[in-house]
């Protein structure tokens, strides 16, 4: 099964709503929640870690994470939407934007996705984490 829809919008732009709608319409959708739900076996985390560290244009086995999906929205797929479009040239691209603009998107992101980093407990834990 090949990707038919590729999301180019970042998280906090309605991607979870789009993903829910696509799933209901029969388009199994890959979203950041898939990465988080698969972290126990690390297969998705390891794949995306490699993508982040490889030079752009490195050949990839996209089916390793997208097997069984017809759509991808949100992170991490939105960060490589151009590569995905090259791999799936018949796919359509969906761009989601925050309805109140870039500044509102930033505030929303800081208050949710990056909120743990601002907590003092997180700062203490980072001291205890091993460094690579």
Model features per residue range: what roles?
Residues 1-61:
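PAPS-dependent sulfotransferase catalytic core
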Residues 3-6, 68-71, 92:
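Short active-site oxyanion
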Residues 7-9, 33, 73-77, 97-98:
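Short His-Asn-centered micro-motif
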Residues 12, 16, 78-82, 103:
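A structural signal for well-ordered alpha-helical segments within the folded catalytic domains
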Residues 23, 27-28, 34, 81-132:
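PAPS-dependent sulfotransferase catalytic domain
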Residues 44-84:
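Conserved nucleotide-sensing/catalytic segment adjacent to the nucleotide-binding pocket
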């Amino acid at each position: 099964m090949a990707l038919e829809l590729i999301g180019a919008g970042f998280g906090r732009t309605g991607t979870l709503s789009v993903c829910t709608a696509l799933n209901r319409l029969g388009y199994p959708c890959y979203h950041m929640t898939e990465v988080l739900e698969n972290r126990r076996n690390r297969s998705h985390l390891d794949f995306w870690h490699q993508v982040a560290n490889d030079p752009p244009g490195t050949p990839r086995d996209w089916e390793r994470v997208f097997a069984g999906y017809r759509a991808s929205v949100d992170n991490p797929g939105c960060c490589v939407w151009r590569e995905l479009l090259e791999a799936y040239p018949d796919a359509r691209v969906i761009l989601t934007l925050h309805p109140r603009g870039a500044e509102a998107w930033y505030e929303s992101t800081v208050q949710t996705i990056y909120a743990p980093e601002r907590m003092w407990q997180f700062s203490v834990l980072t001291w205890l984490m091993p460094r690579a």
